[in-house]
């Protein structure tokens, strides 16, 4: 499914929220895809998925969308400047893992701004290392990432972030 929230970043006011699949308020017990031959149990499971507000009730690992958080935290902490240069060979090895950039051959030399534009994993791994665990958690706290948004919608899930003491241990 798809979930989208559009909100005012200054005060958290929600302008729009949508979940897909969605349901008709006039026919809440009608599945979107009626072509399936489902048992009663399967139909109930599908209805519960359809009625669930995944925007606030589900948790996700954010992937590359979290790079804006890393960027903000690093710039605020002075761990990086816009013109700092980095080198992307196409991957970076962390412990026993090869973490790849989406550009297999690498971006080569690039500034921080170019690394953001390219969503370059090796650049962001270096930025995260410069920032350190404490700096990253400080930035996340300042941006409210580690707590509920406390919006006026029932069923908001808690964060799934690791505790700071367990990161890098």
Where are the regions a protein language model picked out?
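Beta-lactam-recognizing serine transpeptidase/beta-lactamase-like catalytic domain environment
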Residues: 2-64, 69-169
């Amino acid at each position: 499914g798809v979930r989208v929230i559009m909100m005012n970043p200054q005060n958290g006011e929600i302008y729009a929220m949508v979940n897909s699949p969605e349901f008709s308020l006039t026919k809440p017990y009608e599945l979107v895809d009626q072509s399936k031959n489902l048992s009663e149990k399967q139909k109930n499971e599908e209805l519960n998925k359809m009625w669930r507000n995944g925007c606030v009730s589900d948790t996700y690992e954010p992937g590359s969308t979290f790079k804006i958080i890393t960027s903000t935290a690093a710039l605020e902490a002075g761990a990086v400047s816009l013109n700092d240069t980095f080198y992307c060979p196409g991957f970076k090895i962390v412990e026993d893992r090869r973490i790849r950039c989406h550009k297999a051959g690498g971006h080569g030399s690039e500034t921080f701004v170019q690394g953001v534009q390219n969503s370059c994993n090796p650049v962001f791994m270096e930025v995260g290392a410069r920032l350190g665990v404490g700096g990253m958690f400080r930035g996340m706290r300042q941006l409210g990432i580690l707590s509920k948004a406390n919006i006026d919608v029932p069923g908001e899930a808690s964060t799934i972030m690791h505790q700071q003491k367990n990161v890098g241990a």
